[in-house]
Amino acid sequence: MPLHRLHGLYAITDPALTPDEHLLPAAEAALRGGAKLLQYRDKTASPTQREYRAAQLRQLCHQYHALFIVNDDPALAAQVNADGVHIGQSDGGIKAARDQLGGSRIIGVTCHGDLTLAARAAEAGADYLAMGRFFTSHTKPLAPPASLALLRQACQQFHQPVVAIGGVNPDNAPQLINAGAVSVAVIHALFGQTDTDAIEAAARQLSACFQTNRSAP
């Protein structure tokens, strides 16, 4: 599995910010700006539409040598030959996802700010652990908060890469990277921008944080 490539800016789409007609241009702007991973997250589209868009996004990601991850749907990830899937605590388990995707695909798991959940995910075979929210989140304002101290502990405790999420922007991303996060997952600070030029500029700012702060792939 290409875990050595799990490093840098992790862009996550949002149907409220990237409606269907804007999805591909917005995603490409983030990739031009240096996003190394892109997760397709849309629980409102029809299965046919999701398959169509996922296939397009996979092709686009691979043009930019980025990893393509599908949110919460191992079957769709397998269908479009995605690089992996991200599952939450309320979604199907890691074993079920692994059975569908095989051993060569990435499986990431939401662990919130809970080291016990992270330990369970690590033991079950997760390839990366998503921790957060670390800052006030536009997308999930009611998500339980997590501390930088917890992030440092998770990065030291687990051999799996830790992805930090929740209210991440160019101003606070360095704190997460310096605490050990190999990647920062971003929604609103990217796709909440006014146009594709602004999305690309925000992606460049976020990507630059990995050049000037301590983080190792």
Swiss-Prot record:
Catalysed reaction equations from the record: 2-[(2R,5Z)-2-carboxy-4-methylthiazol-5(2H)-ylidene]ethyl phosphate + 4-amino-2-methyl-5-(diphosphooxymethyl)pyrimidine + 2 H(+) = thiamine phosphate + CO2 + diphosphate; 2-(2-carboxy-4-methylthiazol-5-yl)ethyl phosphate + 4-amino-2-methyl-5-(diphosphooxymethyl)pyrimidine + 2 H(+) = thiamine phosphate + CO2 + diphosphate; 4-methyl-5-(2-phosphooxyethyl)-thiazole + 4-amino-2-methyl-5-(diphosphooxymethyl)pyrimidine + H(+) = thiamine phosphate + diphosphate
Binding-site list for 2-[(2R,5Z)-2-carboxy-4-methylthiazol-5(2H)-ylidene]ethyl phosphate: S137, H138, T139, G167
GO terms (BP aspect): thiamine biosynthetic process; thiamine diphosphate biosynthetic process
Residues holding Mg(2+): D72, D91
Catalytic class of the enzyme: transferase
Its job: Condenses 4-methyl-5-(beta-hydroxyethyl)thiazole monophosphate (THZ-P) and 2-methyl-4-amino-5-hydroxymethyl pyrimidine pyrophosphate (HMP-PP) to form thiamine monophosphate (TMP).
Family matches, as NCBIfam families: thiE
Identification of the protein by name: Thiamine-phosphate synthase
